Regions:
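A well-structured
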Residues: 1-52, 68
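Contiguous, non-catalytic segments that form substrate-binding/exosite surfaces or channel walls
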Residues: 36-232
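An active-site-proximal "capping" alpha-helix that borders the catalytic cofactor pocket
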Residues: 63, 273-290
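Short, glycine/acidic-rich hinge or "gate" loops at secondary-structure transitions
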Residues: 64-72, 88, 258-259, 293-308
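Active-site recognition of the HExxH zinc-binding catalytic motif
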Residues: 235-252, 280-281, 285
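Post-HEXXH active-site segment of zinc metalloproteases
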Residues: 251-278
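Long, well-structured alpha-helical subdomains associated
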Residues: 285-382
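Extended, compositionally biased alpha-helical segments that mediate assembly or anchoring
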Residues: 365, 369-420
Length: 420
């Protein structure tokens, strides 16, 4: 099926639009036409036993909120209605943090419209989680601080958000393949973000391994040695948190170019994931600068944040610029280079210009947020075609990193897996 065929079908059959754009349907041929089939039907043979297992788990847990989520998610697998179980997950307060179901849309390269199934089993690190709760009291201030007109700001979105720092003990499905997730902000349902907020989950042991095994070595290879001392795990850790918080900041449901009130992902189509990941990265920096200025963060300063962020962009680009995170990183790198926030220092290395980095971040945040606020597909396309690309400069750096792991590959020995 082509993009054009899909769009022509919706144009000719507007009653099908909602089902066709639903996160939880597959599109298949039916005679000469197309039909949307709910996941609960398309994957019944897998989801029925999965629902049974969730009910078995619910029967043996003593935590009421975890039990509620597991039972609700089991029902969702068979009904295809995930709203109640997503609300139950946001409200869940359990020492075991469980995520299971269809969530991210990165695998849908045509429209970023279909969610893939994944699972995380984690244990909550309560002391670390408590340390970060202070930021939640300032989400409205961070929204107010966004570099866009007030008409584009949304003070309801994310107001009920929570933060959990966890230790990952098992993953499966979409979470297991390819680039390993370091943190996530869910659910993606804008109705729930508006009414209940979202949950930000940081996988601390994963983040530590990523920084140690690939992030820091890459940054030391790319940056001028004079700035090596500014590399900071605390800056990386907090920027990852603020990246996730920033998924809940800015526009979500908008009045689009067609006058309809819909999620901006509908209008941005295949460009949405890269725009959103880049927005979260850049707005994360912008909001973290706010936290530094207000003394909410004292473990590092702005120069350490700038250097750590710049140094780790190549880590994301190595995932592939066609991937949402890699494309977003290329966009950032090329934008900062154009604005003079990152400059060559000789011998293929680069330095961060602290005097220009903040303004470059502000300008890029404004551009990305405006695209999301207006649902401007053409503007998104122009931005990505100009900046989310490989360049001779980038291609000259990548070969020099080939001895550094692209990412980590977890082995869950507690689940019976063996080291290779």
């Amino acid at each position: 099926m082509t993009r054009e065929e899909f769009e022509k079908w919706i144009a000719a059959h507007p009653a099908d639009q909602e089902a066709f754009q639903n996160l939880y349907t597959v599109i298949r041929r039916s005679g000469p036409g197309l039909v949307a089939i709910p996941y609960s039907e398309a994957y019944r043979d897998a989801l029925t036993p999965a629902a049974d297992k969730l009910r078995e788990a619910a029967a043996i847990t003593a935590n009421a909120s975890l039990k509620k989520f597991l039972l609700a998610r089991a029902d969702a697998f068979l009904s295809n209605n995930y709203y109640d179980s997503d609300v139950a997950w946001v409200e869940m307060d359990s020492p075991v943090e469980v995520v299971i179901g269809p969530y991210e849309v990165y695998e849908d390269e045509m429209f970023n419209a279909k969610a893939a199934f994944e699972a995380f089993i984690t244990v909550v690190d309560r002391p670390e989680s408590e340390k970060l709760k202070v930021y939640l009291n300032h989400l409205s201030d961070m929204e107010r601080n966004l570099p866009i007109p007030d008409a584009y700001k949304n003070f309801k979105r994310g107001s009920g958000s929570t933060i959990k720092v966890v230790q990952e003990i098992f993953t499966a499905g979409d979470a297991r393949r390819g680039v390993q997730t370091a943190a996530f902000n869910l659910p993606n349902d804008e109705r729930i973000r508006q009414s209940n907020g979202s949950k930000n989950v940081l996988l601390r042991n994963v983040m530590q391994a990523k920084f140690r095994q690939s992030g820091e070595p890459i940054a030391r290879r790319v940056l001028d040695p004079s700035q090596d001392s500014l590399l900071s795990f605390d800056a990386y850790y907090n920027h990852t948190l603020f990246h996730e918080l920033s998924h809940s900041l800015g526009p979500g449901i908008i009045k689009g170019p067609d006058g309809k009130m819909q999620e901006n992902r509908i209008y941005l189509k295949a460009f949405y994931s890269t725009i959103e990941e880049c927005k979260a990265d850049v707005v994360g920096i912008w909001s973290l600068l706010y936290a530094i200025d207000k003394k909410l963060v004292t473990a590092f300063d702005a120069p350490k944040l700038f250097v750590t962020d710049a140094g780790l962009l190549f880590r994301s680009m190595r995932f592939g610029i066609g991937e949402a995170h890699g494309g977003g990183a290329a966009l950032e790198w090329n934008w900062y280079r154009e604005k003079g926030a990152i400059v060559p220092s000789g011998n293929g290395r680069f330095k961060v210009d602290y005097t220009k980095f903040r303004e470059a971040v502000r300008m890029l945040a404004e551009e990305l947020l405006t695209i999301e606020a207006t649902g401007d597909y053409a503007r998104a396309e122009r931005l990505l075609k100009k900046y989310a690309v490989s360049t001779p400069e980038i291609e000259a750096v990548i070969p020099g990193l080939k001895d550094i792991p692209v990412d980590i590959t977890p082995v869950f020995v507690g689940a019976g897996e063996k080291m290779p």
